[in-house]
Amino acid sequence: MVDVNRFKSMQITLASPSKVRSWSYGEVKKPETINYRTLKPEREGLFDEVIFGPTKDWECACGKYKRIRYKGIVCDRCGVEVTRAKVRRERMGHIELKAPVSHIWYFKGIPSRMGLTLDMSPRALEEVIYFAAYVVIDPMDTPLEPKSLLTEREYREKVQEYGYGSFIAKMGAEAIQDLLKRVDLPAEIAELKEELKTATGQKRIKAVRRLDVLDAFNKSGNKPEWMVLNILPVIPPDLRPMVQLDGGRFAASDLNDLYRRVINRNNRLARLLELNAPGIIVQNEKRMLQEAVDALIDNGRRGRPITGPGSRPLKSLSHMLKGKQGRFRQNLLGKRVDFSGRSVIAVGPTLKMYQCGVPREMAIELFKPFVMREIVAKEYAGNVKAAKRMVERGDERIWDILEEVIKEHPVLLNRAPTLHRLGIQAFEPVLIDGKALRLHPLVCEAYNADFDGDQMAIHVPLSEEAQAEARLLMLAAEHILNPKDGKPVVTPSQDMVLGNYYLTMEDAGREGEGMIFKDIDEAVMAYQNGYAHLHSRVGIAVDSMPNKPWKDSQRHKIMVTTVGKILFNAIMPEDLPYLQEPNNANLTEGTPDKYFLEAGQDIQEVIDNLPINVPFKKKNLGNIIAETFKRFRTTETSAFLDRLKDLGYYHSTLAGLTVGIADIPVIDNKAEIIEAAHHRVEDINKAFRRGLMTEDDRYIAVTTTWREAKEALEKRLIETQDPKNPIVMMMDSGARGNISNFSQLAGMRGLMAAPNGRIMELPILSNFREGLSVLEMFFSTHGARKGMTDTALKTADSGYLTRRLVDVAQDVIIREDDCGTDRGLVIRAITDGKEVTETLEERLQGRYTRKSVKHPETGEVLIGADQLISEDMARKIVEAGVEEVTIRSVFTCATRHGVCRHCYGINLATGDAVEVGEAVGTIAAQSIGEPGTQLTMRTFHTGGVASNTDITQGLPRIQEIFEARNPKGEAVITEVKGKVVDIEEDASTRTKKVYVEGKTGNGEYVVPFTARMKVEIGDEVNRGAALTEGSIQPKRLLEVRDTLSVETYLLAEVQKVYRSQGVEIGDKHVEVMVRQMLRKVRVMDPGDTDLLPGTLMDISDFTDANKEIVISGGIPATSRPVLMGITKASLETNSFLSAASFQETTRVLTDAAIRGKKDHLLGLKENVIIGKIIPAGTGMARYRNIEPQAINEVEIIEETEQAEETVVTEAE
């Protein structure tokens, strides 16, 4: 077998007949498979041992030679070689076809490769191949046209007219093979190149297509006649197995049936030819052979598929590769793995951040080999077999050994669907009783897991390297930040938030207010003995916390705080300031001075003058975690998170906050508000009946009235709410629920959508506390059901989007430190009208500058060129009033097949500069795809009558952008730079005309009457600026402007959709994806290069070709950038393995074979497919060529049989 790690690239070509013969170990002549009596393979049949090898290891068919010592001998009785049975997965056979047969991929694909090569239409080809017409191969001296078709009747007439043998015309694949042999590639190519100089329109398109195929044949060394088969390879029998079921029946792969049909028809044809049967019978048999081979290669591609029992179409060779169940996606890209298990998950509140609970029974099974090794090492058992028995019997001593074995041996936990890289993390196992895996509550958010019956899978990394990588790179305690936005992903939720919220509440006049304590212990003791309440404001000596960063003026004083806050601050990292107020100033600058007593001041007086602070909410906790991470990095942060979790759980348990129906408040003036709304609606309807308003106006007025009534109730609720009400506390702290849930419980449910999407005029006046009437309940059900179905559809849609994104960007890896480009991207805040979608500060963080940034007023250099912009620096730049900065960007990076470190900036998941080898493409795809499920599915109508354009938003808009489709509600853009001089309205055609006057020319644009204008008379506009509201068509923008403008536009559009839904995604992720959509150019004029006009190629390949020509003094080629949707871009990738495993497998492979394509294995997918280590992370060449230093030899235990086999494999 080939050693996977040795080769650099992989090529696919057409197989010549001699190549097929060289693969084959013999001809399959009979359709028989297995003898049903002896269950032995039949001679010369599809499972013949002589051809394919023995069915049992080291044993010939007749049993004369058994045992390994006869290795390599061919038995003189039965002719079977004595070898491993595994060769039946490798050895191929062949069938000598008695008539040539066309290969359906090349004849039927779109475009038909045979048709283009011969310049014949697919219809004509089909008639010839399936014996419906003759084709003239050589007219000789007759006036017939070469390649013209003749029907049976016309053929006979022409033979009578010109005489037998005066011209050559044939039928079937044989005729096509003759024509293909006669194609003179160099001459045809030269002719087409001449034609291209003058051709236009359809003719030109066809010529470019033909030239493409002919040039591919010419360059690859494939011969066109190889598209017609004279010999058919038979794949190894173990790849199309036959298995005996209970009850003596057999289950066989469909391929065997398909091969049997081919062999039967081929043998019958041979017999007919021997007997000199009449031509029509032979023709019919040849046609049937052709159809049998078609079905074997791609069943159902032409005509009706051949069916098996129960009219089920048989699975042909093409179906074995295609789709989710095909070879690529089922077996090569995702395999099942051993040393894995799955179970339901339960919460493990006592676990540390890096631990997970593994049930004993599961652990002993997963770590069995490790335990067995230890048993033998400790001499509890003499050999491995005895150790295995010991484990299986459940000997008492195995549990202690298991404890030792799992120490320091991380395991991986994975929850499906794995939407981003945080869906698989490593933990240190802790043995537990029971049968459920225990999961740390803080990692639930990353996994999107809850404990309502979710299951998770567990995997054991086996090798030392795998364990090291799991520990260093995948340990859950290391994954504090979310790779999509660099914000903490492990923020506490629910009980933890509620506990800390309750703990940090302040209350006036509670027991113990004004007490002064000398240190923390004293305060805790007073609280535990009931002298002071958690929420009472008390004094504490600052000197009892000497390690906090106090100002000098604050030391040696008494500070006013609450007992709860003393406990809360006790778990904080020591270098963080003492937190009194939930705001950033306290967190970053220190504790405010107003909480400290001056000498001789009365503490009660100070307390009375201080405002009551609000407690710490979920958002504040998130900020504290982010600040802790920024200062102390992962180790300290994960320890702090565990303390925060424990404190939260403890105090939410003590507080005992519960919800009962009595906790839902009653709004005193609800009846009045609703009464007023009823009167208003009545007035509106009267006005409508009098004809004072249109139906649309009436509808809008009524729905607005009810909306306002609901808002009035909500406002009243908020005004009258009691901060000590448990529901309010849960909502306010961010533990669970929001104001809209609250207002449905206590206010009114409000307006509902009808099944057609229109809002119903009848609102639901009741709330959940009062209960709904039957009719109201019925109105509610539609919304609830639609929510469920929407979610289900959205999940599938979002998953497919992620798959396409991953596919297009999987080969984008950080390849070098600095690409040395002199280009950059000018960035400013992204705005949508007046609203700021993304601030400049957010966009600057973690990027490298391209030019130095100067203070706009003083001219002082704030930061030099090519420097990393930190969070503080970004704030400083924005505060200085700088509005735009030129940064290094993925868009302008010059690295081939990837990005360099400087153009990418920091790795958002670690907060440090990105490492070489980071698979940033995959991370970008996951970061954009993972929040996809949070986006809405709807197409919104913009406010009633005002406009008739539907603006697509949410997931459909994201798909529209990434697939580069023409948007709905397209904006009109200007092609000239200049000034808007006039806007005319034309009532007769219901349009407006916009006139733009520029230096280079004038433009006149017709826009629909109803479109909202974005410009006014006198406005200056740039090329590509939108004149009306709506989305710009990116392909149109690319024609008018340059690549960078399109990239910037797409980036801003994606951010608008995500930010409007409250999802933050780092710019760099979108940049990586958009760059992949603009990697290709189309050659317009080849100049002196040997490129073909109209070819699509990679920008870097194009510049390379031009460099060579310019050096030798020739004319360079010109090209035009092409914008591709992500699906198209994935299929156009340089790697045929990656493209074939994505979509349209047969089309990709057909094309690659004709071109003799080489896959240089640069991306991740192609390496996974062939089983090579991926060239990212530790798999990169620069990290792999390190010589390991052996410290001490590892002893290997071998049993005699194993030893025997080892010797053999070495001898091989």
Swiss-Prot record:
One Pfam family per UniProt: RNA_pol_Rpb1_3
GO cellular component terms, semicolon-separated: DNA-directed RNA polymerase complex
Gene3D superfamilies in alphabetical order: 1.10.132.30, 1.10.150.390, 1.10.1790.20, 1.10.40.90, 2.40.40.20, 2.40.50.100, RNA polymerase II, clamp domain (4.10.860.120), RNA polymerase Rpb1, domain 3 (1.10.274.100)
Binding of Zn(2+) 2, residues: C819, C893, C900, C903
One term of GO molecular function: DNA-directed RNA polymerase activity
Reaction(s) catalysed (UniProt annotation): RNA(n) + a ribonucleoside 5'-triphosphate = RNA(n+1) + diphosphate
Cofactor binding description: Binds 1 Mg(2+) ion per subunit. Binds 2 Zn(2+) ions per subunit.
InterPro entries assigned: DNA-dir_RpoC_beta_prime (IPR045867), DNA-dir_RpoC_beta_prime_bact (IPR012754), RNA_pol_asu (IPR000722), RNA_pol_N (IPR006592), RNA_pol_Rpb1_1 (IPR007080), RNA_pol_Rpb1_3 (IPR007066), RNA_pol_Rpb1_3_sf (IPR042102), RNA_pol_Rpb1_4 (IPR007083)
UniProt entry keywords in alphabetical sequence: DNA-directed RNA polymerase, Magnesium, Metal-binding, Nucleotidyltransferase, Transcription, Transferase, Zinc
GO biological process, one term: DNA-templated transcription
Family according to the record: Belongs to the RNA polymerase beta' chain family.
Name of the molecule in the record: DNA-directed RNA polymerase subunit beta'
